[in-house]
Regions:
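Donor-nucleotide binding loops and adjacent catalytic segments primarily
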Residues: 1-70, 104
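Short alpha-helical segment that forms part of, or immediately flanks, the ligand-binding pocket
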Residues: 65, 83-89, 108
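Acidic donor-binding loop of glycosyltransferase active sites
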Residues: 69-79
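A short alpha->beta transition loop at the rim of the catalytic pocket in nucleotide-sugar-dependent
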Residues: 71-72, 90-92
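Acidic, glycine-centered active-site loop in nucleotide-sugar glycosyltransferases
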Residues: 90, 105-115
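C-terminal "capping" alpha-helix adjacent to the active site of nucleotide-linked donor transferases
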Residues: 111-137
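A short, well-ordered alpha-helix in the C-terminal region of glycosyltransferases
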Residues: 138-152
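C-terminal alpha-helical cap of glycosyltransferases
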Residues: 151-165
Length: 165
């Protein structure tokens, strides 16, 4: 399962990334594209991939964690919350800096700590995602870095410290 996240408002080049995955990967697989609340993007992608058994378009959902837990790899912009959620879910992550310079520190941190791979464009993102799906050791090394770097219960620890102090 490939998961392409375009954010809550549905930005980025999800279609180009999907095209590259379809070109590079074969066999039994599904690409889920989460388009958020962007109805224009949803319509465009549904028309483009009508009849394609490998592609599913998903609008805004509160069940992102379910998609993350099912994914073999996720491609997303480097938003802080989404990136951290991916690391907590231990899903191999490819980050593509789409449009905001404020997310540049996120991609620098995640990629330098082995929590993600940085992609320069749609083709690069697809290439890295397919490589992570095919190379189980590479994907597991990223999961291990995620386990060792991101504390999934950090909020509980902070609350406990506040209550006990």
């Amino acid at each position: 399962v490939f998961l392409i996240m375009s954010g809550g408002i549905g930005v980025g080049n999800a279609g180009a990334i999907c095209d590259e995955i379809l070109r590079r990967h074969s066999g039994a697989f599904t690409v889920y594209i989460l388009v958020g609340r962007n109805s224009d993007l949803k319509q465009t992608l549904e028309e483009k991939y009508a009849g394609n058994e490998h592609v599913r378009i998903v609008t805004f959902t509160k069940k992102v964690n379910v998609y993350m837990n099912a994914a073999d790899v996720m491609i997303s912009k480097p938003g802080g919350l989404t990136s951290t959620e991916a690391a907590v879910a231990q899903v191999p992550l490819v980050q593509l800096l789409v449009y905001t310079a404020c997310e540049a520190p996120n991609i620098a941190f995640f990629s330098s700590h082995g929590l993600s791979e940085r992609a320069e464009n749609a083709a690069d993102a697809a290439e890295k995602a397919v490589a992570l799906v095919r190379d189980k050791a590479r994907a597991e090394a990223m999961r291990e870095a995620q386990r060792n770097t991101i504390a999934p219960n950090a909020a509980d620890k902070i609350a406990e410290r506040i209550v006990l102090s």
